[in-house]
Structure formats: C-alpha cells, structure tokens
Amino acid sequence: IRRPPRSTPKPSSAASDVYKRQELITCDISGYSSDGPSREMKAYDMLVQAETGLSSVTGSPREPSRVGVSVCDIAAGMNAHAAILNAIIERKISGKGQAITCSLFDSMAEWMAVPLLHFDYGGKSPKRMGLRHPSIAPYSSFVTKDDKVIVISIQNDREWNKFVVRVLRTPKLLEDKRFSSNIARVRNRKSLEKKIGSYFLSKTSVQLSKLLRQNDIAYGYLNNVEGLSKHSDLRRTTVNTESGPVRIPSPPYRVLGSKNKLKGVPYCGEHTQIVREEFSK
C-alpha cells in the first residue's frame, strides 16, 4: 500500500495485525522511510528523483532531467515484491509472517550507490554528460549520413585498435598519442568525437551497422518509442482487459518449457469476496 502522509497511524493497522496473526505478511510502501525525518512529506516519482540526486546525473550538461519512466515507483515495487517473496519462503520455514516497509527514497538511494560512492570516497560528483560515458571514450552517439543516430561503445584498447583499423580505416590514428589509451581518449574526448563524427556523417546507418557488426564493435541505434514498437527483438504477449485484448511487452524472464502466459487484468472488485473469505477464517 502506498500511503500518503497521516493516512494511517504508525505503525499501520495492517502491520499491527501481524502480532494478532503471526502468519500474516504485510508490506507498507511509502515515499520516505517511516522512521526518517521526511516521513511526513509527500513523495511522487519525480520529486524522489530530484531528492536522491538521480536528476543531477541525468540529462545534458546544460540542465538536469527526469528519467523518462517512473523509476522510483518501479524500484520500490520491485523491492517490495522481492521482500514479500522472501517473507513467504521464511514463513514456510518458521511459520511466521513479517511486517515489511519499503520506501521510494531508499529504493532509489540504493540504485544511486555508484555515484554516491564516487563522491563519498573520491570527493567528486559525476557530471551530466547526455549520451556519453563519464569515464570511457569513445562511448557516445554519432549522426549518420541518413540522419540516424548510432551509439558506439569501445571498452578497451583492443577494441579501439580494431575500430580504428577496420571501421574508421585510418590506422595512422593509432600513432596519435592523444588517443593512445582510454585515459588519453577521455581527456581529448572533443577531438576524438570530431574525428569519429566526421566519418559517421560520410556513411549511412546501414553501411555503419554492417561494418560495426562484422567487426564485433558494440553499438545500438538511438530509437524513439516508435522504434521500440517496431523492434525485431521486442517480444509481446496479449492480456485481456474489460476494454478488450491489449498487447504488452512480455515478461523479461522466461522459464524453460513454459509459455509464460499472463492472466487477464482483474476488473474492479473481482477478488473482493475471495479476499474477505480468506481473511475471515
């Protein structure tokens, strides 16, 4: 249950019932930790993105941005789901339930562990760089002759050598000390991206895709939502709703030998009686 401030006493009435029925598992989802100084504050996804510093490392150098999907809501839901499953397993062993609490802030703070550790132990906050990696180069986006955008990722010197010789076809570039190591390439990122960008503008996306794939260079297209909808790797499944069938992305996991079919979306009140009967026992 995602509770607005002051909607229930602390601890919640649901959690208190654990002490009456020891096998009961409850989960309270809130914006901030129930025992923290911000526990009474309202918390919506974008606000938590801002509070946790996520927005400070997202977007272009000119301005911060929100992540395009509600990651704080999703993260809290995933953590709650994992905690409930863990509690179910524990109950099979001990026979006892658990009162679980989970907050959006704590969930996103955990996801921010890497930039947080960079600051706590390195004294530096990561900068916003758009579609660039802060510590690897080249790892950024380039426009092609036919106005497509391709993102490439060169992870080590071996890949860099192959990229220069087989894709850019300018082996003399390997002699340039400005690009002789990843540290040097990051330091001279602007000059590096100018050279690569010039070459990419001379080739179509199809030509570049073929070259990159043939030489096992990591790359991807910068798609929009339409591109995702038409993507050859997108798996879909159909679920029934009150308004009719809807095709949605398939669950990301697959179980060998199972078709992974989803049940229809419950209509309002569909399980009311079942739940009442279960809790009246």
Report residues per predicted region.
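Aromatic-enriched alpha-helical interface/lid elements that frame and gate functional surfaces
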Residues: 138-215, 219
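Flexible, small-/acidic-enriched active-site or ligand-binding loops
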Residues: 239-281
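Glycine-centered tight beta-turn/hairpin loop motif at sheet-sheet or coil-to-beta transitions
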Residues: 6, 145-147, 243
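Active-site-adjacent "lid/gating" segments in soluble enzymes
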Residues: 17-154
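Short, surface-exposed loop/helix-turn segments at secondary-structure junctions
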Residues: 119-127, 231-241
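Short Gly/Pro-enriched turn/cap motifs at secondary-structure boundaries
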Residues: 129-134, 140-141, 187, 243-246, ...
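Conserved PLP cofactor-binding pocket of PLP-dependent enzymes
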Residues: 213-237
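Single conserved hydrophobic/aromatic residue that forms the stacking wall/gate
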Residues: 1-15, 19
